[in-house]
């Protein structure tokens, strides 16, 4: 059993925010792999899905970003899922737009959702870092992540979420390097291998 968590803020007001790309990716997995309907559980919206040979719970916390760990810890305890089998998909300022990296453990890089999960559950979970780029000035970060993706960004956002969903069985199987490589190749094949500016193909 895996616990796959997308981070974001609940409600229509935040649905298109850059901070909510984790929700978007989990929604793409749910659609593509015919998950059960999401229902309110564990202080979030949860669905069941089979990815390859692995059963997984998809979770979108309803606690707002800064309290994400409450929902994650509740679901993790209920299903007795080892921390190494908890996978968190989140926005990453320090990666270029349309890039993806997977890592286990490590720092939180100022991400309040990760900080909350680490405080509640521990640090040794897997993170799928979904690059959104950086606005260039630390003072602009708050507004940047809580603004919607621009119209020019939406094509790569949709392609990245689709690629994550396409190869989610590798992620569930623990084949992180293969998953990361497949997503990279898929994005390169769609022309997103070198996004110089937000939304722009090279």
Curated annotation (Swiss-Prot):
InterPro entries: Pept_tRNA_hydro, Pept_tRNA_hydro_CS, Pept_tRNA_hydro_sf. It comes from the Bacteria. SUPFAM superfamilies: Peptidyl-tRNA hydrolase-like (SSF53178). Its EC number is 3.1.1.29. Its main location: cytoplasm. Keywords: Cytoplasm, Hydrolase, RNA-binding, tRNA-binding. It catalyses: an N-acyl-L-alpha-aminoacyl-tRNA + H2O = an N-acyl-L-amino acid + a tRNA + H(+). Pfam families: Pept_tRNA_hydro (PF01195). The active site is at residue 19. TRNA binds at residues 14, 64, 66, 112. GO terms for molecular function: peptidyl-tRNA hydrolase activity; tRNA binding. GO terms for cellular component: cytoplasm. The keyword tRNA-binding applies. One of its GO terms (biological process) is rescue of stalled ribosome. It is found in: Cytoplasm. The record marks 91 as: Stabilizes the basic form of H active site to accept a proton. The record marks 9 as: Discriminates between blocked and unblocked aminoacyl-tRNA. Monomer. PANTHER family: PEPTIDYL-TRNA HYDROLASE. NCBIfam families: pth. Belongs to the PTH family. Hydrolyzes ribosome-free peptidyl-tRNAs (with 1 or more amino acids incorporated), which drop off the ribosome during protein synthesis, or as a result of ribosome stalling. Catalyzes the release of premature peptidyl moieties from peptidyl-tRNA molecules trapped in stalled 50S ribosomal subunits, and thus maintains levels of free tRNAs and 50S ribosomes. This is Peptidyl-tRNA hydrolase. The lineage of its organism: Bacteria, Pseudomonadati, Pseudomonadota, Alphaproteobacteria, Hyphomicrobiales.
């Amino acid at each position: 059993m895996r616990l796959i968590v997308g981070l974001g803020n609940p409600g229509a007001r935040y649905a298109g925010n850059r901070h909510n790309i984790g929700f978007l990716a989990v929604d793409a997995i749910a659609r593509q792999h015919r998950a059960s309907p999401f229902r309110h559980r564990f202080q979030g919206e949860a669905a069941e899905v089979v990815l390859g040979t692995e059963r997984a719970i998809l979770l979108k916390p309803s606690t707002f970003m800064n309290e994400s760990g409450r929902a994650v810890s509740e679901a993790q305890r209920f299903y007795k899922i080892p921390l190494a089998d908890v996978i968190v998909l989140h926005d990453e300022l320090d990666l270029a737009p349309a890039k993806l990296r997977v890592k286990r453990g490590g720092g939180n890089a100022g991400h309040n959702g990760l900080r909350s999960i680490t405080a509640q559950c521990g640090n040794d979970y897997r993170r799928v870092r979904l690059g959104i780029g950086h606005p260039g000035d630390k003072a602009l970060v708050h507004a940047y992540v809580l603004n919607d993706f621009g119209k020019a960004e939406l094509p790569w956002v949709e392609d990245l979420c689709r690629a994550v969903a396409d190869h989610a069985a590798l992620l569930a199987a623990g084949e992180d390097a293969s998953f990361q490589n497949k997503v990279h190749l898929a994005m390169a094949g769609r022309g997103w291998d070198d996004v110089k500016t937000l939304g722009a193909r090279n």
